[in-house]
Amino acid sequence: ASYPIRVFLMKDIVTIGIDTSGVSLHKRGYREVAGKAPITETLAAALIMLTPWNKDRILVDPFCGSGTFPIEAAMMAANIAPGMNRSFTAEAWTNIIPKKLWYDIINEANDMIHDDIEVDIQGYDVDPSVIKIARRNAREAGVDHLIHFQKRDVRELNHPKKYGFVITNPPYKGIEIAKVENTVTDEDV
């Protein structure tokens, strides 16, 4: 097994550590393909956690792209551990960490999953090719049955229920903000 060493320098301080993770932790293992400007999985999860959203409330991403916000929300709702679909460098260190311990941790995390829940998580985008990518990513994450993805323009954003959350990573260009602002009224908020 290899033991990658990481050295960090900041001014006159040196920190030396062993990399137990391998690939960066923001790579959850479900997103093989992404859209043009994807938000990292960890940032999406953190932004969702900053809201009072919970699985009993509606969550809509009107510019869902490759589906990161809806997928992270569905994983939270189903209590799926963020690292379930990836491997870690330390898994190969069986001389330090017994293989059985990894199996026990994975089994415990699997036992905590609640995928038979009902949630209202929706992802929309005008580009049908990214909706296809979002569906594939949700399937890889094991939450495709919890999310409704649809080709839809943000100007058609509406929902029969009164309260919920809109969380999104809007496109950086090619959309007129004034049109989006006119779509959402004070009554909608």
Regions found by a protein language model. Give the residues of each.
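Non-cysteine beta-strand/loop elements that form the S-adenosyl-L-methionine
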Residues: 17, 167-168
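Conserved S-adenosyl-L-methionine
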Residues: 39, 43-158
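Amphipathic alpha-helical repeat scaffolds
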Residues: 137, 168-175
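A short acidic, Gly/Pro-enriched loop at the edge of an enzyme's catalytic core
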Residues: 155-167
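Glycine-rich S-adenosyl-L-methionine
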Residues: 180-189
